[in-house]
Amino acid sequence: MDTLKNTSQGLGTPERRTEAVRQPSLRRANFEDYEQIAALQIRNGLASTCYQAWAALWIDNPAYHKWKADWPIGWVLQTGTDKVVGFLGNLPAEYQFRGHELRVSTPVSWVVDESYRSYSMLLLDRITRQKGVDLVILTTVGPKAEPGLKAFKFSKVPVGTWNESEFWITNYRGFSQSVLASESIPFSNVISYPISAILFCRDKLKQLFREVDRSTSDIETCSEFDSRFDQFWYSLAHQNPNILLARRTRETLAWHFRDAMLRHSACIVTASKGSDLTAYAVFQRQDKPEHGLKRVRLVDFQSLKGFEQMLLPFLSWIFRKCNDEGIDLLEIMGRWLARPDLPPVFAPYHRRLCSWSSYYRAINEELSEILKQSDIWAPSSFDGDASLW
């Protein structure tokens, strides 16, 4: 969904005003605020979306259905003339951990007009003080938001390297053209190889994917999340009671990837044993049209015990598909596959990001201590809102 999500833009592309202002009031947002919130986003340089798509973030969210009686959709800053000058959305998500259901908040669409930006922390403070929430997770943190999170004692997600990405070039000519067309040169670590032929020769010296035991003929694609995903989720949760996992039922997956599926920008690949799923991956098209870059990202991979090796055939399959279809780049944001329970994956290229994108804060002290242990984390780009739009 092309919606209003980029924290760094929302706080860094201001509406130009210089007059002194009075402190705005803080109140709970409601669906009737949509027009003012959309206007706020637009005047701060962000894209908008239709009311139906915006409201569906909550109305169609299975976790919101469960908790809507006491779950705010967010908070707004409002002037004495009832003008909305700030907003921070509050998306609910259900996680499982050690047999318990955790209520998790994902703050989204943080934006404040420049004249009122000194009051922006009121919104974050309210998020951290809401009742009945166990954990707050952010996964699209920009550089301008990071200092505020640190001030509110948010911690970096300890698994993954969330200020880096790793990638494979799948179309050398297209990739080289997009790098040269980019003013900001986001892939400056490979700019010394701007010519596609040189890049190709370099990669031919590397083994992009080691030999795997399973044939990619075992892989199937799905046009939707079918009933097998429910049984897969219950098996996955049962096998991993000590891992913090976002709920991945058929209903939740369908909601999360609904807009990507409608745009035909998500690809679901699966492996099965008989009629039962044993592993799946979701790849998502996330292009950068201003630079002419065509890009696919791995946003989620899950497997039952004993089927972790399916990661490699999945990557090999999508690599060839990208190559065949002229996609320039296959990327993994945050390097979250670097876990001892998964087979090693070696991408030939890496790039540095402008911030550490994934932070969390536990609301109670006991959970806060537990979450310091890296072995209970198994994050991916499914968490938070990184692949929601």
Residue ranges and their predicted role:
Residues T79-D82, S115, Y172, S178, ...:
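Short loop segments at secondary-structure junctions
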Residues V111-L122, L304-P313:
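Conserved glycine-rich acetyl-CoA-binding loop
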